[in-house]
């Protein structure tokens, strides 16, 4: 397979590795960019690609809480110019108020929901698309419920670039919001170690094993020592991706688990939405993007 400059560029942006390393990795994986990124990690040339590296779609997220129910959702636009537009932010507020007063728990249910005007949300969004001049789309809707004894913590970062909701075993508004802020910053993939799926363990174990095998300073070491190194590195990875194992944002010397224990509380669940998370999108030249807006 022919390895193009565009493929090398994409892999460099994803991993931060050098041009030649990226080209070689692509050649070894027959042009498979994801496989090449993993190969670079195994060789210790690149760190794990983060989800943020792939965030390109624009728009806003929002979280709305009323009593024992909360709704989080994401509304996408094509550019951040539109996401900052008052008409777009007003639409976010309108949808949030409509969703929290209903029972919608999915995009499909939300799109068919009718507002005070008699129009469905889908019709309202199509109208906004026509008026604003960019495609507007509702991507995610999540509904969360709690009991009277439990507590919500909601936090919106940068006006809605990220929205987080936490659910605590016992109501504690300050604690719940602190945890929501922590989750905003550290973006844990799992709540506890028991939630970590086997595929994640297998991938990380393979990457670490290859790193150890390629480390000349570890050549000839006893298998027991190498296994200890592997487990130590795997444990460090888990500490980075598991919420309860992470150092607490306000006091990194203690884990989130210990912080909760000191407050005699537990976190039951959380939801974190970040604009464009996981969406692949062509990134245009900034100047060209500006001119595209001017010429509309």
Curated annotation (Swiss-Prot):
Determine if RNA-binding is one of this entry's keywords: no
Q: Which InterPro entries match?
A: EF-Ts_dimer_sf (IPR036402), Transl_elong_EFTs/EF1B (IPR001816), Transl_elong_EFTs/EF1B_dimer (IPR014039), Transl_elong_Ts_CS (IPR018101), UBA-like_sf (IPR009060)
The subcellular localization recorded is:
Cytoplasm
Instruction: Specify the signal sequence span.
Output: none
Region spans: Involved in Mg(2+) ion dislocation from EF-Tu: 79-82
| Entry keywords, A to Z | Cytoplasm, Elongation factor, Protein biosynthesis
Q: Name one GO molecular function term.
A: translation elongation factor activity
Family according to the record: Belongs to the EF-Ts family.
Cite the NCBIfam families for this sequence: tsf
Task: State what this protein does.
Answer: Associates with the EF-Tu.GDP complex and induces the exchange of GDP to GTP. It remains bound to the aminoacyl-tRNA.EF-Tu.GTP complex up to the GTP hydrolysis stage on the ribosome.
Q: What is this protein called?
A: Elongation factor Ts
Q: Which organism is it from?
A: Acholeplasma laidlawii (strain PG-8A)
For this protein's source organism, the top of the classification is:
Bacteria, Bacillati, Mycoplasmatota, Mollicutes, Acholeplasmatales
